[in-house]
Structures are given as C-alpha cells and as structure tokens.
UniProtKB/Swiss-Prot annotation:
Keywords: Iron, Metal-binding, Oxidoreductase
Protein name per UniProt: Tyrosine isonitrile desaturase
Gene ablation phenotype (knockout): Disruption of the gene maintains the ability of the strain to produce the pyoverdine siderophore. Deletion mutant is more sensitive to chloramphenicol and ciprofloxacin in comparison with its parent strain. This sensitivity is probably due to transcriptional repression of mexT and mexEF-oprN genes. Exogenous addition of paerucumarin resumes the expression of mexT and mexEF-oprN genes as well as resistance against chloramphenicol and ciprofloxacin.
Catalytic activity: (2S)-3-(4-hydroxyphenyl)-2-isocyanopropanoate + 2-oxoglutarate + O2 = (2E)-3-(4-hydroxyphenyl)-2-isocyanoprop-2-enoate + succinate + CO2 + H2O
EC number: 1.14.20.9
Cofactor: Fe(2+)
Family classification: Belongs to the TfdA dioxygenase family.
Subunit structure: Homotrimer in solution.
Length: 291
C-alpha cells in the first residue's frame, strides 16, 4: 500500500517478525524514493498511525545526525518529556553498570513512566548503531489488547482479580507503584494490561531488579498468574522482537504496549537513543504511590 505525502510515495505494510509471522499490531513504513528523510513525514499523521497500529517501524529513511536533531524532530509530536539528563536517553552498554538498563542483560516486559509523576504516551527510538545479527539485543514489544484477546476465560478471571505492587530505586528516582493487571486505557477506554514482568527467578546476575508483589490472588496462584501472562504476551500474535538496523526509527504506544529487551553480546555495537513524548494533556501517573 502506498500513501502519498507532498507528492512523495511512502510504502506501508504490516509489520512481520523474522519468521514471517504477522502480529496483530505494528506497521512498517518505507520511503518511495532514495534519500527521503523521516522529517518529511507529517508528525501528526504518524501519531494517528501510532495510535491505530501501536508500533511503527520507519526503515530506509535518512534520519538524524545527532541527539539534538532527534530532539528537534520529536518536538513536532508534542511535548517532549524531560529527565535530569535532558530529553534523550543514550541506550548503550556501560562498563560497571549499576542498572540492567545500561548492562547487556535482558530487560523484562514493562511500561515506561510507571515510577514517575507522568507517564509518556509514546517512545521514539532511533538506532545509531545496530548490533550484529548474532549479537542479540532485539527490543521486544507486546500488545496488551492482543494478549487479552488470546487469554481464555479462566486466565481473564485470574488477571482481573490480580494487581501488582512494585518498588524500584534507580539513578533518577526511587518510587513505588501499584496497578491492576487489567484496566482501561487512560484516554481511550479499551482494556489494557499493566504488568511489570519479574526477571527470571533466581537470576543473581540481573542488576538492580524491582521488588514485585501481587495482590488479589492466593500466594500459590502467583506462578499461574505469571505463566498465563507470559503465554499470551509472548504469543506470536501479540509479540514482536525487533532486530535493529542503523537509522531505524521506531515509534511505540507506551499506553497500550509493554516492551523489553533481549540480552546482547558484551561490547556489541548497540546504541539506541530514546525520547519520551507526553500525552495531550500530560498524563498524571495514576499508579504512583505518593506519600
């Protein structure tokens, strides 16, 4: 399918994983002419696509020379969320990392902003350097509406009773959050999941994990809860693992999806930049436990 913008064709097609499976979300956008820049696509048009398809991959476009260029581009999407370090998080392995985000660990599924005063609507990722095909490091995305559609009645009943309590200390925050597993999208009312996945049980190598507690269910049902959520969230129709190429741009719906990361080879050339975009108006975090 072609879309014509400023007389320039853009090819749109369903997103597919490396095995050719088509999940129930995601859209691939490719340029219709050599040298076409991402910035030629209207930001509001892309936002509409992201709200409909939840995940956009823009591949093959000319992109951004530096973090400042990416930030200027993101301002067209809406209000950019600022951190103490600025607008852009440099996602690259750090020697002696004190948090799993900056190590080469896997990162379990979660949503961004769960420990902050506001929750961003979108993440914008730009791949500066891609790891090799054998290095790992794919970014994972799971559609929570698709997972809800895949669950059977007993799983749904368990999920609707359960809620999670989480606590985490990191470089820029130390907070507690509590959220029902199943709730309504904060702006659009359809059901979603808010689930922060624990790391592999007993994995002592995982750096700075959150604390996890689940209420509303019997203690012996914890394993059933986690297994059923993982079954549906990692189902090929609900899950997409993205292998990066340099200059890929990914726009993700943080209010609908969960995301994570696969482990990657130590010192692999994996460098992403991430920017958060606020909702309109900015979404005050309903799950943050305020003292």
């Amino acid at each position: 399918m072609n879309a014509y913008l400023s007389d320039q064709p853009v090819r749109l097609s369903p997103l597919r994983d490396e095995q050719g499976n088509q999940p129930r979300f995601g859209l691939l956008l490719e340029p219709g002419r050599p040298g076409m820049h991402v910035g030629e696509l209207p930001a509001q048009w892309l936002k509409g696509l992201a709200r409909s398809h939840h995940l956009l991959l823009l591949r093959g476009f000319a992109a951004f020379a530096d973090a400042e260029s990416l930030t200027r581009y993101c301002h067209d999407f809406g209000e950019v969320m600022l951190w103490p370090f600025g607008a852009v998080l440099e996602l690259v392995e750090q020697e002696g990392a004190e948090d799993h985000i900056f190590a080469n660990n896997y990162v379990p599924l979660h949503w961004d902003g769960m420990y902050l005063e506001t929750v961003p609507e979108f993440q914008v990722f730009h791949c500066v350097d891609a790891p090799g095909d054998s290095d790992g490091g794919r970014t994972t995305f799971s559609s929570t509406p698709a997972a809800l559609q895949l669950a059977d009645s007993s799983e749904l009943e368990l999920w609707r009773r359960a809620s999670g309590r989480y606590q985490r200390s990191a470089a820029h925050y130390s907070s507690r959050s509590a959220a029902p597993i199943v709730e309504r999208h904060p702006r659009r009312e359809f059901p979603i999941l808010r689930f922060c996945e624990p790391p592999v049980e007993g994995d002592a190598s995982f750096i700075n994990p959150s604390e996890f507690h689940y209420d509303g269910i019997a203690p012996e049902q914890r394993g059933e809860l986690l297994a059923s959520l993982r079954r549906c969230l990692y189902h090929p129709q609900a899950h997409y693992a993205h292998r990066w190429r340099s200059d890929d741009l990914v726009i993700a719906d943080n209010l609908t999806l969960l995301h994570g990361r696969e482990a990657f080879a130590h010192r692999a050339p994996r460098h992403l930049r991430r920017v958060h975009i606020h909702a309109e108006p900015a979404l005050r975090n309903p799950h943050l436990q305020r003292d």
